[in-house]
Amino acid sequence: MSKSGRRGRAPALEYVAGNGLLDRRALLRNGIVFAGAMTAGVAGTRTGAAAEPVAADALKDEEWSLEFGSVPPPVQTPSQFEKDVVRTLSNPKGEFRNSHARTPHHLLNGTITPNPLHFSINHCGVPNIDPAKHKLVIHGMVRQPLEFTLETLSRYPLVSRMAFVECAGNSAPMFSSEPMQVTAQAIHGLVSNAEWTGVPLSALLDEAGVDAKAKWFIAEGADAQFLDRSVPVKKAYDDALVAIYQNGEHLMPGNGYPMRLLLPGYQGNMNVKYLRRIKLVDQPAMSYFETKAYSQILPGGKTWRFHFLMEVKSFITQPSFGQALNGPGFYAISGVAYSGTGRIAKVMVTADGGNVQPLRAEFVAARGQTTQPVTTPLAFPNQHYNSITSWGVESNGEIKHVYA
């Protein structure tokens, strides 16, 4: 209370250079008043707005409250009112692509991607693999070649790792000379995050007995194109998994059923699906997928053939193109940030190129290569923002992928 006996008013909010982003000091001072504004709300709903007063008997009994509900199905699916929350089989221009299924990030919240909505890319369709017949063979420069089935792998001690998987070509529209007016799904939909459970590859290699001269292993999938990639042996002993579960379920067919290689932080194509072969070698295979399909052309025409790590990155998920904002007020700007190194220091955001603000986030180093949520409130007065831009900063100060 003030000396005059009147309840003091909270200080006026400070804006950052008129661009709508709230000053962090103002947020700290007004933390109670504006707690609602810090909630990661769905775009289209004003956060921190006062509710309309109603009478105590305003609720009426709708039809669903007056009859028995349906019998729960053997496999639960989302409500019929969520029918638009689906993957899209198209490129960013909306052209049909039967090999691309993009995650609807702008319609989701949190960091775990539901299995049915996890992105997938398949070079030769989704194979219908009988797990009773599928085998994984480890051979090459080993003391004892070994063979594994899904059943035998299930007998080993299993470990779980939270990790994102991202296509090397994700966010390609950001390199367009003209900004594309499309959703976060269309631009950034080729990345998803899950809890993967399986057997550490190092345990299987130790059992096989790897020759000290083996510096690489070649991972090959059982799809009709036999995708293969060369991986340094060191990665196998760091954190590689032969994954057989995805968010507690056996892998989805589009994500590698019955088993896949998981290389946290590495390009998606290196996380070989339908894993059937691991061959220990002293030289990389120099296959089509690593010399052409997934190599980078550098200035001057040279090719960077073995670029593994997915660098620090963030993008805005809400609001996204096509989502309506219900009048002026405060809205949560939400997104995700991730890095192949697992060392994100902060994420920054600006509206229409105004002053820069950090997004609110708690980065837990132990979480490693997994997507992490970020959010900040943004004031939308009676004006229009052309762009909201975010970027992640690694602990060493490195910045990559500045996206609006």
Short names for language-model regions:
Residues 52-404:
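Structured, non-membrane catalytic/scaffold regions adjacent to prosthetic-group chemistry
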Residues 15, 20, 40-43, 53-54:
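Compositionally biased non-globular segments, especially hydrophobic aliphatic-rich helices
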Residues 23-43, 47, 201, 261, ...:
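N-terminal export leaders
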Residues 1-26, 35, 49:
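N-terminal secretory signal peptides
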Residues 2, 18, 29, 45, ...:
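Generic cytosolic/nucleocytoplasmic N-terminal low-complexity/intrinsically disordered segments
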Residues 10-13, 28-29, 33, 50, ...:
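General helical structural elements
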Residues 5-8, 23-24, 28, 45, ...:
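Short, intrinsically disordered low-complexity segments
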